[in-house]
């Protein structure tokens, strides 16, 4: 082997060693990057879990501090009525387009025929100036919502408390953004004397196919004053998952 050949072979070995070293360094860098990414993902998961856990726990403490105590709210016991009317749409776009108002069996309604469209919006608190139609909100009840109705003569003065309750309740697992506060329309019937606030929910047990309704009921509770503790107890007793159409928006 000539000196030139030896030199070329040596250069080739050196070049190969350099390539191997660079490949090794590249593998190390990739392993470090992968490790950092994995660590960041774990940290993100931990932070997300902690945030969700804190979100779940915080409303439980806060809700009971809003408004008056349960004892001071002067609430009647929850009334449970046999329910019907699921899937019965009236008004525009239905087979009964001239029906613009439903005469409900209870005040406030907790079940019954309703307009074809529920209220689908990020807003959860309404005033007299922009209140949805009762018939739209009954459709929301069918989808698992709880509605807190308020007498406008008393509710307007307590809008700050109502907003705080709505914000906190919508973070509960029992509600998860299915809680609406809206003024009551006395044209649909007057609240009993001394009652200014009312909760209603349309519950149901689904059949094995998760589409048919095996049984259903309407639930109402009327109060003289607003109590976060009462609201929390009601929505946890009648959660969003108990409804004729719990998967509706």
Predicted regions and their residues:
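Hydrophobic membrane-insertion alpha-helices, especially the h-region
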Residues: 34-47
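Juxtamembrane cytosolic interface motif at the C-terminal end of transmembrane helices
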Residues: 46-54
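N-terminal Sec-pathway targeting helices
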Residues: 25-37
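Mid-length scaffold segments of soluble, non-membrane domains
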Residues: 124-174
